[in-house]
Amino acid sequence: MNKLLLSWAASTATPVLLLAAAAAPIFMAGCATFAADGGFDKVADLTRERVGVAPVWHRVPGDSVTAEVRSRIDELLGQPLSADASVELALLSNRGLQARFARLGVAEADRVRAGRLANPRVSFGHLRGGGVTEIDRSVMFDLLGLLTLPVASAVAAQRLEEAQYQAALAAVGVAAEAREAFFGAVAAREQVRYGEQVVESADVASELAQRMQQAGNLNKLDRMREHAFHAEAVAGLARARHRSVAARERLTRALGLGEQLSFELPERLPDLPQTALEPRDAERTAVERRLDVRLARLAAEATARSLGLTRATRFVNVLEAGYVNSSETGAPRRDGYEIELELPLFDFGATRAARAEALYLQAFHRTAAVATEARSQVRESYSAYRMAWDLARHYRDEIVPLRRRISEETLLRYNGMLVSVFELLADSREQVIGVTAYIEALRDFWIADSRLQTVLAAGPATAAVPGTAALPVTDAGPATSAAPYVDSAALFESAVAGRARAH
């Protein structure tokens, strides 16, 4: 792009122009300053509305946190964790989330920079020859930047708001991950306990089968079957223990814990709620409240403002003015002003305008796509939630009680010498397997419940999040007995004792 430099020497009105040019950047420089909170207060409010707890931004590098935050972390870790405590811990100590918060500082700096004029340019020239010395001085200011300052500041402010919504979305995501990891860790621990019961039962059956074969009361094939089941139960328990370790480590990562690994989990998952949620206007609520939908709208609005700025500066992209002073040996000093602008001889700004229009069109369609996906995700998530609740209730009200009654009937038949001890042990194993399936169904329900809340409040359900206004939160409360505890060894011993009394 060619540039045309126009200079005039003016003997009058120069002081006025100089004063105006010098005063403008000084005045405008005070219009944009850094906020005391760095833009974080809005992030805290958005997160609190959806999670129930506000995050904390550790703005001091290093491992140090405030004494108040450290005290709260120690307090939460000093008692068995709950879903809500896991969420609060994650918002206090997750370092990945702190890294996302640091992006706010970048956006805040860009906003302040956009609200200030570019620094003036000063030039000094010194020529000497033939006994003559010529000195040129000039000070140049960006007039175009001054004229477009309000629009540029508004665009940067919207970009900061985008960064705030992105940070809040990240905070809700971390809270959701912590909540889901909590339910997974508790369920995995329960499954280990019931897996140990299966191994105990299989161990008793295998040892009894070996003794009965030695006594000639059991054939070799039946004895090997019992032994094979015992071996498979041991292998299954090993896998369950690893899954428990993996689930606990996932929770540790979500909480952002480093050396503090001795946190305690509750014994059981929370009970299944008596009634399922019935959402009203869930799709409309999601479109209005979801952070990703709001973020897409903000991006489209900021792109529209950028498009307006591009159109306004389409033909003149460089416009500078300033004071010029020239002195020469033996001649009076000359004062004037200089204007520098860029002439659109080869590019009339069509490429920049076309690019800005394409970006706006992209943002417009992305916003519509996000809203469409939000509605679909709400319907899908509620279907998963309702299926999980129905399935868990079916296990709670039908399968587990039926297994218990079958076990009681089998014990009566064993005491009446109508079934063998192997049938009694096999039935106890089946009961444990049924209880384990109920634990899995209950875990899946709580995860589905949490993901539904995430879909309604923030964005795609990658994890769980508590507390939204769209649907009442099902209070998990303290962990209570999720399923009956079946002690296979004790059951076998009581059966043998009952058999002895019968004789």
Question: Where are the regions that the model predicts?
Answer:
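Bacterial N-terminal signal peptides that target proteins for export
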Residues: 2-18
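Periplasmic alpha-helical coiled-coil/stalk elements that build and connect Gram-negative outer-membrane
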Residues: 3, 32, 149, 165-285, ...
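A small-residue-enriched
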Residues: 31-56, 88-145, 244, 248-260, ...
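Regulatory alphaC helix of protein kinase catalytic domains
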Residues: 59-89
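Short, charged, amphipathic alpha-helical segments
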Residues: 101, 157, 220-229, 421-429
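Alpha-helical heptad-repeat coiled-coil segments that mediate oligomerization/polymerization in large
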Residues: 219, 374, 381, 417-420
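Short segments within alpha-helical structural elements
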Residues: 232-259, 366, 402-458
